[in-house]
Amino acid sequence: MGRGRVELKRIENKINRQVTFAKRRNGLLKKAYELSILCDAEVALIIFSSRGKLYEFSSASSMMTTLEKYQQCSYASLDPMLPVSDTQMNYNEYVRLKARVELLQRSQRHILGEDLGTLNSKELEQLEHQLDASLKKVRSKKTQSMLDQLADLQEKEQMLEEANKQLKNKLEESAARIPLGLSWGNNGGQTMEYNRLPPQTTAQPFFQPLRLNSSSPQFGYNPNMGANDHEVNAATTAHNINGFIPGWML
């Protein structure tokens, strides 16, 4: 028994709809490829899923080539005597830019490793070479950036060395202008040698030295002495006192 005829209507089951889309899409892409090979025809196929995902096939070098050819053929069939309105020109520009944007988006997805199932071995090889060239450019740019940073650091190092040298020269000049009497000790303290004070002139002492009487001192009362002797001793004692006590105390 053969398969029954499939009714053409929207498949309500989501899973069945996705499975059917994948099978029919692959079959359609295969048919387009076979047509381009068997009949040597230029075939371009564009498919958008319900979620807006793009699937395409182009037997030419790029989809843009086929689209530009299609655009030229479509508008060349118009009567050349009829003036082209601004609206038509704007629409033509819109179609061209839209095709360009779609091509760039497709290339971007391929570079990111997406939607590679529709590419053949030749296109995959071209993509590999493109990625290798891009990687070499990135590495070269990174190396150049690191070399520039190294050169800047070396220049700053030279500037710091020059500034350090100038500060050292200023410090030596300042040290040369300091008096010889000022020096720095090993312990970081400051030692200053002061000039010796001039010798003081010899002055009279504040207190005069005591001058002792040659006669022996007498202590107590001697009964053998007479009145005249006591008077003599009193006078002698007064004289001795005058000799012992400074004049300013009398």
From Swiss-Prot:
For the MADS-box domain, which residue ranges apply? Answer: 1-61
Where does it reside? Answer: Nucleus
What keywords are assigned to this protein?
DNA-binding, Nucleus, Transcription, Transcription regulation
List, alphabetically, the PROSITE patterns matched. K_BOX, MADS_BOX_1, MADS_BOX_2
- Tell me a Gene Ontology molecular-function term this record carries: DNA-binding transcription factor activity, RNA polymerase II-specific
A Gene Ontology biological process noted in the UniProt record is: positive regulation of transcription by RNA polymerase II
One GO cellular component term, please give it. Answer: nucleus
Start and end residues of each K-box domain = 87-177
The record's annotation in SUPFAM superfamilies points to: SRF-like
Q: Write down the superkingdom of origin.
A: Eukaryota
Principal cellular location given in the protein's record = nucleus
InterPro entries given for it? MADS-box/MEF2_TF, MEF2-like_N, TF_Kbox, TF_MADSbox, TF_MADSbox_sf
Q: Which residues form the signal peptide?
A: none
User: Per the record, a Pfam family?
Assistant: SRF-TF
- Cystine pairings recorded for this chain: none
Q: How is it used?
A: Combining natural and engineered alleles of J2 and EJ2 provide a wide range of inflorescence complexity that allows breeding of higher yielding hybrids.
Q: Which PANTHER family match?
A: SERUM RESPONSE FACTOR HOMOLOG
Q: Which purpose does this protein serve, as stated in its record? A: MADS-box transcription factor that acts redundantly with EJ2 to control meristem maturation and inflorescence architecture.
Listed name of the protein: MADS-box protein J2
